[in-house]
Amino acid sequence: MTQKLIYFLSQTHIRSAIAEAWAKRLSLSNVKFISGSWHKSKSTPFIAEALNEFAIEPPESLSYSPSSELLADADLIVTIYDSVHETAPKFPANIQEKIIYWDIDDPEQEIALPQKWASYQEVCDNIALSVKNLEHVLIEA
């Protein structure tokens, strides 16, 4: 059985790292999950804190930049963007059929600390639900 490659991609790696962490908890033995960003990768302690509420560690893997080779190798590319504050990246026509988009708020848009923390918690919950729904798609495929 060939292992599928699922690539989570977001602007600064924050939401894609959260998605990778949730996805690695799925019971899918034939799937490899990686994450990356289309802009400079950013790190924040809020990622670990939001995931630790669910006893999940953030991924230790690198942020993979979307190279032509990686995009071609991926079986599914999950592009996570905030439609209010970001523009989703454009992809070559030959890979459009393997791209899905999740419109999930960018928690870094919040400035005040209490609101930013609440936003991270909400984003973590939304990504968890999206990943769980993705599991059903992958099982059926």
What are these regions (language model features)?
Residues M1-S68:
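Conserved active-site segments centered on acidic
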Residues T2-Y7, E69-I80, Y120, E140:
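Cytosolic catalytic domains that perform sulfur/thiol-centered chemistry
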Residues H13, S83-V84, I104-P107:
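Short, solvent-exposed loop/turn segments at secondary-structure junctions
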Residues A17-A19, P45, T87-K90, I111:
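Short glycine-/acidic-enriched loop or helix-start segments at secondary-structure transitions
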Residues S35, T79, I100-D103:
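Structural signal for conserved beta-strand scaffold positions within catalytic alpha/beta enzyme cores
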Residues S41-S43, L70-L71, D106-E110:
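A short acidic, often aromatic-flanked loop/helix-cap motif at beta-alpha or helix-coil junctions
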Residues E69-E97:
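Mid-chain, well-packed structural core segment of small domains
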Residues A88-A141:
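Phosphate-binding/catalytic loops
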